[in-house]
UniProtKB/Swiss-Prot annotation:
MF GO annotations: methyltransferase activity
Enzyme Commission identifier(s): 2.1.1.-
Catalytic activity as recorded in UniProt: desmethylnectriapyrone + S-adenosyl-L-methionine = nectriapyrone + S-adenosyl-L-homocysteine + H(+)
Transmembrane stretches, start-end: none
Name the UniProt record assigns to this protein: O-methyltransferase NEC2
Gene3D superfamilies linked: Vaccinia Virus protein VP39
Keyword annotations: Methyltransferase, Transferase
Gene name linked to the record: NEC2
InterPro entries: SAM-dependent_MTases_sf
Protein function: O-methyltransferase; part of the gene cluster that mediates the biosynthesis of nectriapyrone and its analogs phomopyrone A, acropyrone and zaepyrone. The nectriapyrone biosynthetic gene cluster consists of two genes, the highly reducing polyketide synthase NEC1 that produces a demethylated analog of nectriapyrone from one unit of acetyl-CoA and one unit of malonyl-CoA; and the O-methyltransferase NEC2 that further methylates the NEC1 product to yield nectriapyrone.
Keyword Methyltransferase: yes
Similarity field: Belongs to the methyltransferase superfamily.
Amino acid sequence: MASSRDRAYVTVYSPTLLTWVYDYYVLGFNLRYIWGCPTDAVLLPFFAENFSRRHLDVGVATGYLPARVLASPWRRAAAHRQHLTLLDINANSLRASDARVRAAAPGIETTCVEADVVADLPPVLASVVEEERARVEKAGGEAGSSSRSCLYDSISMFNLFHCVPGGPAKLRAISTYKALLADHGVLSGCTVLGERHATGWFSRWYLRLYNRKGIFNNINDTREEFEEVLNKEFEEVDTWMFGMVLLFRASKPRREGSGYVDLLA
């Protein structure tokens, strides 16, 4: 059973924090001044660049990023053709995010999934893989390769892994959720790295504090660990560092010997 400390990253996202604190303190102050990666100048454009009409957002917080992207005039006008799946371990986050994206883009189709990212795919998403398997068998083609694929064209994991406990083992989520990505699809995300990547004494102190409180679980996370897993699971991988934040984008998912093949078996 998870300890109360390990559960802190789940319970910290109360309705009050999500409504009054998260956007300004976490996305505004912390990312810019503590971690060195401003949301408006770096994360929002990066999210928008890798956002598609069939998108899965894993670890949604307040829904700030998809809502901002969907609020653009041309996205808003095409909201009726947009499908967005929101996944989070916290029900408060899901409710807040769903309401926010629906307000930003009336007519959008959303699906909310409450699940732990380090567990197996929840049934509603495992069924997507099964649907794709059935489509492939009927069409006699390759999974994920058709424009009619049931899989997602893009998956995002922003500000997720630095919260999740489990050490390097938590990165199995990349393999698990890669199974939902079409061959032409893109996985993108960002994470605050561990103590080795601290940019100064204050960011190191702040990082240790967050880890002691259980808000973060990333004290030993490294760029090399993420790159190793991403390169194992994808043919094309790009990573960038902004302060202590690693941005990653991966495409051309490898199928052999992966969780994807296991799920289709």
